[in-house]
A protein has these predicted regions:
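Active-site-proximal loop/helix segments of hydrolase catalytic cores
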Residues: 155-197
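Pre-active-site segment of Zn-dependent metallo-hydrolases
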Residues: 30-58, 142, 149-151, 185-195
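Conserved beta-strand hairpin/beta-sheet module of binuclear metal-dependent hydrolase folds
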Residues: 2-49, 159-177
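Short hydrophobic-aromatic micro-motifs
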Residues: 32-34, 124-133, 175-178
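Short, charged, surface-exposed secondary-structure boundary motifs
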Residues: 66, 94-97, 186
Length: 197
């Protein structure tokens, strides 16, 4: 049985504080931090809840946006042993562009031997799998149209090839833990259902 605790989301819930972003703590066969939000707030809220993140086995960063991986450096400072899983290309420079205004929304690159760049679906064991590459049969969210990444000397629409999700098998059930689902939630569900029929 897995227990999922939301450490960060947009709306605060007393006594926890909120910020734009997401961070979840999954306790089960493995203890996994899924996304960090944009700052150290995930750790502050975990402390309020009595959760010891120093004992987490792993961290997963769903994609290369500040509101999901901005606290990665802080996590690695409070946990000196957890492996970190992040999609290949997640540290590319990313921007939101609206009304000709360009705003950086990427995450600072972190270099460590503990960081594992995920290039394809990766079983972690104990019923946990990192899923990558989702196809596009169902299209993607309209909100993606303002999101770009650096390529050469310019910007191109973000392909979200770095996006990863966590799939948890629990008996006959399959649970999908995702960040923003920039690849499209229906595409993600279809990919998971093909891997876990």
């Amino acid at each position: 049985m897995n227990r999922i605790t939301c450490l960060v989301e947009d709306k605060p819930s007393h006594p926890l504080m909120g910020e734009h972003g997401l961070s979840l703590y999954i306790e089960g066969e493995r203890d996994i931090l899924f996304d960090t939000g944009q700052s150290s707030l995930f750790a502050e809220n975990a402390s309020i809840l009595g959760l010891e993140l120093g004992g987490a086995d792993a961290a997963i960063i769903s994609h290369g946006h500040y509101d999901h991986g901005g606290g990665l450096r802080h996590f690695m400072g409070i946990n000196d042993s957890a492996e970190v899983f992040i999609g290949e290309g997640a540290f590319r420079r990313r921007y939101a562009v609206e009304d000709s205004v360009k705003r950086f929304i990427g995450i600072p690159e972190v270099k460590s031997e503990r960081i594992n760049f995920v290039g394809e679906t990766l079983p972690l064991g104990d019923g946990y799998t990192i899923l990558k590459d989702f196809g596009g049969r169902f299209g993607r969210p309209a909100g993606n149209r303002t999101l770009f990444m650096e390529a050469g000397s310019g910007l191109v629409p973000d392909s979200f090839q770095d996006e990863i999700v966590l799939v948890i098998e629990s008996g006959r059930e399959v649970h999908i833990i995702t960040g923003c689902s920039h690849s499209g939630i229906l595409n993600i569900v279809e990919a998971a259902s093909q891997l876990f029929p």
